[in-house]
């Protein structure tokens, strides 16, 4: 038997052409969305000089994404998934063209930016849900951990590159260039996605979309295993909202403007290391227990983060959180895909992704409230240790998740 390496195995990109096409499309899409993410707030700030108006655009887009995830989950379980993915990407690109044309006007319309933000948020999340539901069919359920780790690396790398490119474009050509290249990138992603095989949903009875969505909710609530995974995911996302305290904590540590960047880079760096060293995760006999313990460790890291006497120690705590949260997230993703019936994959993936979106918003709001009553140090520690207490309770309550065992996949020569 070959020894499995700790390092991430990228062979899936070579052996599975369909996954390679998705990998390429996702990377281009992340870079394109990053260009958009830089341009929209800058344009609104330049037009209105109001941070409230910038925040409103983020809130509207987030709301549209939530609705898109719900609708996308139902569509992915009822219609051919490749068509849903292509339709969502193409429609999203049309919205980017609208933003580009609006930016070229002598007096761009603020209302148009808001409406197109709703449009793009809805259709972007629609395609995400269908793609998640299709992944097991593209790579095989035995390769989901590897696929999830490669995807996580793609997201992290794209998230680092795209803001830098977006900033350079803003400095040289203005927001219209950002929107135009985002539209071009989105339409380019259609080329590799066209090579995907047909991805029909499993046969199931026709029912009203709301009834179908409620069936997904009922399954989530009735399954201690899948429901517990989703709950842990939401709490983990809440913990990541600690970034709203970075500016205040930077003042407390007397950090320079250049040093503050280390705080923002620490969690993505830790997550990237977690993905790169995930080679043995798929071979864990008790993934549920490992998920619970890594989640508890990540909460502890956030609790200790604000208490550190030096900023460099705080950065180490954040990197540790990034690593542990990556381990937990990869286990969540894999177990969710393998333990959810094929007929429910679209809806459950939509609900899981939606609770991640809302968890981040709730966490930011709670930390903002704590910040009004406590010092930044106390707020960060209270959030981390509070989540740690909840996590310990869940460790005791989620018996089925804690005791879950799986037969590790066989290691073949190509995997080593």
Swiss-Prot record:
Superkingdom per UniProt: Bacteria
Transmembrane parts of this sequence: 22-42, 56-76, 84-104, 110-130, 157-177, 179-199, 219-239, 257-277, 288-307, 314-336, 357-377, 379-399
Topology in membrane: Multi-pass membrane protein
Periplasmic membrane side: 43-55, 105-109, 178, 240-256, 308-313, 378
GO annotations of cellular component type: plasma membrane
Cellular compartment(s): Cell inner membrane
InterPro entries the record matches: Enterobactin_exp_EntS (IPR023722), MFS_dom (IPR020846), MFS_trans_sf (IPR036259), TM_effector (IPR010290)
UniProt KW keywords: Cell inner membrane, Cell membrane, Membrane, Transmembrane, Transmembrane helix, Transport
Disulphides: none
Gene3D superfamilies attached to this UniProt entry: MFS general substrate transporter like domains
Main subcellular location of this protein, as a coarse class: membrane
Topology feature Cytoplasmic, residues: 1-21, 77-83, 131-156, 200-218, 278-287, 337-356, 400-416
GO molecular function: enterobactin transmembrane transporter activity
PROSITE patterns in the cross-refs: MFS
Family as reported in the entry's similarity comment: Belongs to the major facilitator superfamily. EntS (TC 2.A.1.38) family.
Function: Component of an export pathway for enterobactin.
Official protein name in the record: Enterobactin exporter EntS
Taxonomic lineage: Bacteria, Pseudomonadati, Pseudomonadota, Gammaproteobacteria, Enterobacterales
